[in-house]
Amino acid sequence: MLLFMKILVGIAMGYLALYLVVPPGNFVYEGLRLPFWLLKLRKMVKPLPEPRKIKYGSHFRQYLLYFQPLDNSPSKQHVVIYIHGSGWQHGRPEMFVANAQWLTEQGYHAFFVSHRRIPQCDIRELRTDTGLAIKTVVDTLSEQGLSHKKILLCGNSAGGNLCALAMFDRRLLAGVGLSPDIFSALALFATPLDLRVMWPSPPLLMLTRMKNPEVFDLANPIHYLESEVQIPTLLIHGDQDGIAEYQNSVVFEEKLRSLGTKNLHFATLKGGMHLDSASWCIPGHPCCEIFGNWLERIENQ
């Protein structure tokens, strides 16, 4: 028992030392802070009505959680489709109830997407799941008498990557009989938007089958960016991001501007790490303020 306690103390001291000395801007720095960030989200959660779980395929990962707005919340023009991050391989919608709670308190219907994962799958299966999930949202809105609602497509990190592909590669939604014209706004947080500026991390290599050229293009949103984007678009990224390089959003914004896109807001979180861009549901956080103000503007358009 004494040996076990010594091992635990050693691990704790090592963790603390790394926490204090590792500089920002790398995945170790981010990983050391992830448990505390997740705990903070968990502590924010209040009792909510049970979300409706909607399957869109036979695999146990192919489902949505549908969160409905609280009864006393104001009605909104938009519904939100949200795809969470975690490197195309971790996480599940149930971990982001605090985000759903923030949206439902504002009056939004919110659909949180789960999809199959790497390494068992690659971007081809994830694209399929993204299309099927969005089609299921559209069908559910019709069933609920909510087809008049506008759709805000929203994603963080790897989830933002899938959202951007759904928006900019028309073939993705064509496979389920839809087009990107169903979207009225797009919000992307710390998103891998130009995979050419990404370091060859294991998740990226698994996603693209070791950067196979054909598969790589299927995963790279900027590859499909060919014309002006008409809908309101928000990019948020921390300039000290240690997971998805800040340059992703910088290069993507430059390309959008060069194509004539005007309804675009790019917010840089000064000193912000990867987790900061995912903190849009935390009151008082700069990301929450930026996202909240942008939502208010698009609601009033």
Predicted feature locations:
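Conserved alpha/beta-hydrolase "acid-adjacent" motif
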Residues: 242-251
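Short beta-strand element of the alpha/beta-hydrolase
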Residues: 76-86
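Short beta-strand/loop motif that positions the catalytic acidic residue
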Residues: 228, 235-237, 241
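C-terminal catalytic histidine-bearing segment of alpha/beta-hydrolase fold enzymes
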Residues: 250-301
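N-terminal cap/lid segment of alpha/beta-hydrolase-fold proteins
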Residues: 26-73
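Mobile cap/lid helix-loop segments that gate and shape the active-site cleft of serine hydrolases
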Residues: 43, 191-224
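Primarily recognizes the serine-hydrolase "nucleophile elbow" in alpha/beta-hydrolase
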Residues: 135-200
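Catalytic nucleophile-loop/oxyanion-hole region of alpha/beta-hydrolase
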Residues: 91-100, 111-150, 278-286
